[in-house]
Amino acid sequence: MDTSQDIVIADSNTTDNVEVRSISPRVAAIFDDIYYFFYKEIDIEFTRYTDNKLISERMYGKRIDFFISILYITRNIIESYNNVELLKCFFKMLNHCSKPNENIENFLMKLFTYLHSDSILDNIEIIRALRDNKLKIRRETQDYLNQILDKFYKKPKEAEERDGDDGLPMEFVRQDTLSKLFREIYNDIRDLLPEPIQVRHLLSRNIDGTFKLKEVLFYEFDRVSEDHWFYDDGKQSNIYSPEEINNNTNNKNSVLLDANDKNENNNNNNDDADDAAADDADDADDDDMDDESDSNNNNKNSNNKNSNNKNSNENNKNKRTKSSSKSPQLPGLWTDEECRSLIKAVMIIGHRWIKIKEDYYSTSKRKPSQLKDKMRSLRKRYGDIKNIAIAYFTKAEIIEIEKLAVLFQQKEEAQKLAKEKIDSLSNIKSTSNTSAASGHNKGKNENNDSDEEVDQDSDNDSNNEDNQNESESENEDENDNNEKEKEKRNKKNSAVPPAPAPPKKLKPIEEEESDEEHNDSEEDSQEDSEENEYIIKQKRKSNQIKSSPKKLKTNQSVDKSEDVNQSHKSKLKSKPQRKVEKEESEKEESEEEESEEEEEEDDEDYESEEDKKKKKSKKTPSNQTSTHTTTTTTTTRKSNTKPIVVSSEEDSSDEEEKRRTKTLSKKSNQTPTTPTKKPSQTPTTPTKKSNQTPTTPTKKPSQTPITPTKKPNQTPTTPTKKSSQTPITPTKKSTNRPKSIEEEENEQEEQHEKNQNKPLKKRVSEDWSNSSDKTSNKRFKSPETLNKDSKENKKTISNSRRK
């Protein structure tokens, strides 16, 4: 037979003359095999976006694996294939594959051998289209197909050997009439071939017109064959049609149960055969046994066999009944109307499957779980609800559904408000009932105290009816005891009025505890109330004095705030202490008057020396000034005391004395505040008077030489000037007798010698030389001349006093 008669090549011009015929189920099944093996069954996963991140393109994972089953496709298709258009569709499918497998090569080699005839291979349309690049496929697939063609041309001998007598492979069965049917399939389904629903941007097509694989999000598959479901047992050999498989689960279970039943029956038969063989062996070994024993054994074995067969049959029946009861047959496939109603319900109501079942599927046999599963499958296929709605509804229908959803939400909100109002009214009624019940209980217990009525009501409400009598008796006893205690308290309060409470601001935590204890004692002891009040006040004063922080201010002068603190502390002192301080102050005033008579005449020299001392005192550390503060007293009038200075140019004439008195009067008005800035005047509590060791006022400067290096401003002309740094303690002067003039002179000489022996001579001389106060009218003397002048001053003082 000539190949031209058998092979009918359909040209593109003959499409119009083809009669429109219904697609046979066999042809549809063949096409579905190709379609689902390439797109559905093997789970071709195109690149998609999740959370705005592009998933890296897999190396076609299962798409490479599906070529293993290409031989199964050839067994169903290539033997009946005779159309170029279906080959073009197949090549378009290959256009989505990046790395074809060896099985593809074998498939194409068989295909070319099928198309090969004596000399017409070049005239075939598919080959011509491949060479001219007329097929809308990628260049990579074109190059791949050209490579296979080159291989085929290089091996013509093998192709000729494979050809039969007719020049065609013997394994292929030619069916010329199917060419027209395949053309009908292509014309009917080519518009339903996979096209992307969503593309990242418009420039996502290749030059050939195909879509770029990386730009495609997901594909929309045809609805003609989407209801087909294929069961894969791992080997991809068993493909079941939708009629055989009902919603996946029941059919799987039934198939598995049938297989289990077969396995169990086989096992039982094997067990029976083993038992029979064992029995035969036993009979052969026991030939010498009695006939009775043999007959008994045979009867037992036969009984065991029958029992085993019965048990196996019963088990199989029970399993089948259980499977039928657990997995009843579900309704058939989903129709478009059911899918539309499900999508509409989800858009209006939301994911409330029970309500959707009641409102939209009340008459059908579908369950809420099935509705949920169907919606999940639609989401996997289309994506969001919007895309699902676009696939099943028009724009006008979608707008109407959205309006219905808004109305449904408004109704639900109104229902919620009505429920809230009803709940609030019910709560008000319940509270009114409870208040009425509590008022009834209060009327019974009016005779009891007001403090215990709430407790009794709560107890009466909570207790059971059996324990009410016991609770009432206990409450009566408690009421009697409380009444007695109140009567006692009223009597005590009427007899003795309570002491006024002190201010809370001055009370520390310790005092509050002591006050509470003391208040308890006042209730017991009525007669001693006045004494206790006096004791409490003294305790508060002492605690306030102790709690006040003791801070010794160093490197600073006494401020006005310290004077206020001293006055506040002096008020807190007891009466005998105040009397002693008054005597001390009077004695100090008398001594100050005597010292003022012996001050210097020139005010400028005195002020310049004081300024120097102030500058040096600011530089001295706190540890050095603290030694002086320990010997001071807590009197406010000491701030106005002036240092005793012996004038070096005093004469015995009366004129000089008059002039001196005038200067003193002026000086008292000019410099009353300067001595307040000395660091030695910092006050302390009167408890430190024990540290004052000297007995006479002239020997007090002996305390200060503890830190001799920090007093460079001391001039040798005024040896008694140090007495200003340490205040006088007049308390011990009352016991001493008045000293004579000679004794005072001797003491001054001793003190002067001590001061001269100090290591400050060099620093004093330097201060004299480097002093900035050279503009004064007074001529400064050197230390040597001052020593001479001091002796002369002593004589003049003695002469003046004698006169």
From Swiss-Prot:
Residues 237-333, 429-803 are annotated as: Disordered. Keywords: Coiled coil. Residues 271-294, 448-480, 510-533, 586-609 have a biased composition (Acidic residues). Residues 295-315, 625-636, 666-733 have a biased composition (Low complexity). Residues 258-323, 400-429, 463-496, 573-616 form a coiled coil. Signal peptide: none annotated. Residues 332-379 form the Myb-like domain. Residues 786-795 have a biased composition (Basic and acidic residues). CDD domains: SANT_TRF (cd11660). PROSITE patterns: MYB_LIKE (PS50090). Residues 537-553, 568-577 have a biased composition (Basic residues). It comes from the Eukaryota. SUPFAM superfamilies: Homeodomain-like. Residues 429-438 have a biased composition (Polar residues). This is Myb-like protein V. It comes from Dictyostelium discoideum.
